[in-house]
Design a protein with these regions (language model features):
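Alpha-helical, largely C-terminal catalytic domains
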Residues: 1-117
């Protein structure tokens, strides 16, 4: 992967640090999408031995990328999400996966498909 592609993708991921969610932290401020993803990753790691039947590497991938589309769309709370929002989110995910060449982009498309299921 060339440097421009790598840095471009990381720049997009960085937006998740600035995009806030509808939920609040225990300190009373809005949680960023990146903070939400981090905590979910920690949770998945902590319980990985409790679910030996699961492919925990896949669970970690799903946790890592499940809200990546929000770097483009912003947070849309699940309880407010419409069919049009889901379409927009899918388009954003395709745009994001398209930033990565070859197998890496295909892998991300697979992850996004599974997240939507």
């Amino acid at each position: 992967m060339d440097h421009d592609t790598l840095l471009g993708f990381l720049g997009l991921a960085e937006k998740l640090k600035c995009n806030t969610r509808h939920s609040w932290t225990s300190s009373g401020r809005h949680e960023s999408v990146a903070e939400h993803v981090y905590r979910l990753m920690v949770f998945a790691w902590l319980v990985r031995d409790e679910f030996p039947e699961l492919d925990m590497d896949r669970v970690m991938e799903l946790a890592l990328f499940h809200d990546m589309g929000e770097a483009v769309t912003g947070d849309i709370p699940a309880f407010e999400k419409t069919g049009e929002d889901e379409k927009t989110e899918g388009e954003a995910q395709e745009e994001i996966a398209g930033l990565l060449p070859g197998p890496r982009g295909e892998k991300l498309r697979e992850i996004f498909r599974e997240v939507r299921e």
